[in-house]
Amino acid sequence: NVKNICLSGGYALNCVANFKLRQSLPKDINLYVEPVSHDAGTAIGAAKLLYHEMRMLEGITDDPIIPQTTVKYGFQNHYPATYDFARFKKTKVTNKDVAKKLSENKIVALFKDRSELGPRALGNRSILFNPNNSKAKDIVNKVKNRESYRPFAGTILHEDCKQYFDMNVLDESPFMMYAVKAKNYSLKGIRHVDGT
């Protein structure tokens, strides 16, 4: 009679296992994978439970915990925090500007708005590159000082995700908690050896 399953903890960060579990469950069972699946997520859950008990609410909000609920920073905060690592000048950048840089195979570091909570880069603290550029991931791995076998995730508009990825039983993966197969093999810059 279970209709809702929630995964949390370190094992919930296994994107491949999460997707296989979602595929194996009947469609009428909801699977929620906590995007802050580490100690900070436990603290958030404890705070929500205490809030629920103190307020004597009938139910906790249906709103998901969005891993971008922290303080919003402006340029005056960004500049001193990054001055020792990079020199830059203040410029207003639009999504179109970022898209143009990516189309020119430039690597773009996004540092904007609210900090993110959890282990995944979700757009406010992200390193972006053209997913068709197979050499870019080596550069990003070097910048991040990480192993070459580590996978990358694509960022895509919701309405376009099924065109590029085999979402199967999923409608979306907003917090990078599922590994899905890439349909378009031109995405060589982000496609992992297993096709995800």
PLM region descriptions:
Residues 2-10, 109:
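Short glycine-rich phosphate-binding loop at a beta-alpha junction
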Residues 14, 18-196:
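Flexible beta->alpha loop and helix N-cap segments adjacent to enzyme active/binding sites
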